[in-house]
């Protein structure tokens, strides 16, 4: 695990360390990019929540393994100047954020230096480290999933508590965009009046450019009274309402189909399609990818893991020809619809499982001189073998998982590429998530 903020003078000691106990006083000596703090107890490494370097804390053990342990600081005996008072009253019980107790500039510096240190280890040539791509740290999420459960005979709606299955009830969330946050107390009131509360699964909310969309997952059939109450609420709040009783059946009850706009393009999406949840950072990320691709009218560009066309369509506004490839068939259908409404005729979308060989696919027989990769957390390892056969001169890799990026970057370097430049994207402030964009060239 990447570690930063190690204090040279800090003693890596712990009091009462003859054995690991459920409650123990320890001295913290370093901080990793996910906001977990590191201490040594009996020679074993412990990762501790809610602690900072140079602090002395009283910990409670969460779990202990042979090689490491996890704990949480329940009481701060000696505080660090890096600590701040969390602005959310539900922190740290709520599992939505993990780093609100750390000053924002320290969060970002920790992530950036840990990422740079790990990536630079892969090659001897210096990497051009670009400034962090960042934005506001509050009200940045345009999408969320809310858990629902009966607790103490009452229906609770919110996020799951860290390290438990309990749900923390929320009437406000400063991470969600305001139009979604204002719905929280109204939803609590609405579903408290339901007759069939045990039929409820979870709620998904999306703040699209044209509407607020809500999907309600339920088990079994909803009675007429509950459905009528839900429909009236959706109409009163001007929501696009969807019901889902299983993965293969989504019912659209009212409201417009959601879309968002980027670079003058309108991208429609289905309620469960993947979209980037931080709209301002998505715009900055797309623009940075366009800049690093250095697109000309002669370029033929391949976009792997293209989704509904978030990168592909803006690229097609400048390139000679673009091919977008995605594994999820429904998202490919949506990408084709977005292509038709955009009026762009220099782009084609294909459905292909990128975890399997694609050398026999028609699109893979075409020449491409540049490639954009935007894989899920699993990374793009398998498709790299086949991608190398296309010999692109430039690859832009968007990553949401540093571990799989390091693995994939190592393979690209073995195939003759080098990392020319890279930047951290602070897509999810106050959390341990780390996104990045990197450029590989021959």
UniProtKB/Swiss-Prot annotation:
Binding site for [4Fe-4S] cluster: 88, 94, 97, 173
Known catalytic reactions: uridine(1939) in 23S rRNA + S-adenosyl-L-methionine = 5-methyluridine(1939) in 23S rRNA + S-adenosyl-L-homocysteine + H(+)
Family annotation (InterPro entries): 23S_rRNA_MeTrfase_RlmD (IPR001566), MeTrfase_TrmA_AS (IPR030390), MeTrfase_TrmA_CS (IPR030391), NA-bd_OB-fold (IPR012340), SAM-dependent_MTases_sf (IPR029063), TRAM_dom (IPR002792), U5_MeTrfase_fam (IPR010280)
Pfam families xrefs: TRAM (PF01938), tRNA_U5-meth_tr (PF05958)
Domain of life from the UniProt record: Bacteria
PROSITE patterns (alphabetical): SAM_MT_RNA_M5U, TRMA_1, TRMA_2
Catalytic center residues: 400
GO molecular function: 4 iron, 4 sulfur cluster binding; iron ion binding; RNA binding; rRNA (uridine-C5-)-methyltransferase activity
Alphabetical UniProt keywords: 4Fe-4S, Iron, Iron-sulfur, Metal-binding, Methyltransferase, rRNA processing, S-adenosyl-L-methionine, Transferase
Occurrences of domain TRAM (ranges): 10-75
GO biological processes: rRNA base methylation
Binding site for S-adenosyl-L-methionine: 276, 305, 310, 326, 353, 374
Enzyme class, first EC level, given as a word: transferase
Enzyme Commission code(s) on record: 2.1.1.190
Keyword Electron transport: no
Gene3D superfamilies, A to Z: 2.40.50.1070, Nucleic acid-binding proteins (2.40.50.140), Vaccinia Virus protein VP39 (3.40.50.150)
Protein family membership: Belongs to the class I-like SAM-binding methyltransferase superfamily. RNA M5U methyltransferase family. RlmD subfamily.
Cross-referenced PANTHER family: 23S RRNA (URACIL(1939)-C(5))-METHYLTRANSFERASE RLMD, RNA M5U METHYLTRANSFERASE
NCBIfam families reported in the protein's UniProt record: PRK13168.1, rumA
Primary role: Catalyzes the formation of 5-methyl-uridine at position 1939 (m5U1939) in 23S rRNA.
Designated name of the protein: 23S rRNA (uracil(1939)-C(5))-methyltransferase RlmD
